[in-house]
């Protein structure tokens, strides 16, 4: 496990210097395991600072349990935990958005808002990198999902983070580790295995992609690794596009591609009901 993570970390070149890394922790097995792994690798280094960050989207009977789990693991590792909520910043919760029954799945709204809040908070904390617990299964699902949608631009955004105005570089140390290995690590290190699934997941196409991929992996072992190997090769075919830089959103000041960030666009939809 540590060997795979170290290989990925070397490619990011983040930990070669004094650095502050914010770790997005949801309270599930992957994110708490990531925090545990990074702590075990770097706790002896005085030049590396870890901060755990949890987002409260406002999902009743689900998120409070996972935040408690995050708080427990962070306390055990003596890592500071910061909690930010949708309600405080956006004045609306994920449950409230889901109740409006938009054509888009609740996961679309929740994912965009959570990503923006993670980046905003990591930047305010002065982070050099934002680490997320996406494992091999998650990454393969995302790649396949974007193939299905024909969203090539979004595919290329999955490449290793670059220095972009207002954006904290994202790193995914677990991108080569299968979900099953993460579960084993969590069990053997007494970490949370999870608190069930988010109640809004059944309305997301990602669940269908996940089930399809698991079926393919069962019939053809190595499918998920193959998808990621192919994707990594595709990334090499397109120039990195270092000339592109986000511009501040005219509404909130957060990074955007055209002057209005996706977060504000979605919040406008919610406001208009």
PLM region spans:
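Short, flexible, mixed-charge glycine/proline-rich loop motifs
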Residues: 235-245, 251-256
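Catalytic subdomain that performs nucleotidyl-dependent activation
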Residues: 124, 137-218, 223
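Short, basic, helix/turn surface patches
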Residues: 106-119, 156-165, 217-233
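Short cysteine-rich clusters marking metal-coordination/redox-active sites
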Residues: 1, 248-252, 261-264
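ATP-dependent adenylation/nucleotidyltransferase module used to activate substrates
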Residues: 1-145, 149-156, 176-189, 261
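Short, non-ligating residues that shape and space the ligands of small metal-coordination modules
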Residues: 257-259, 270-273
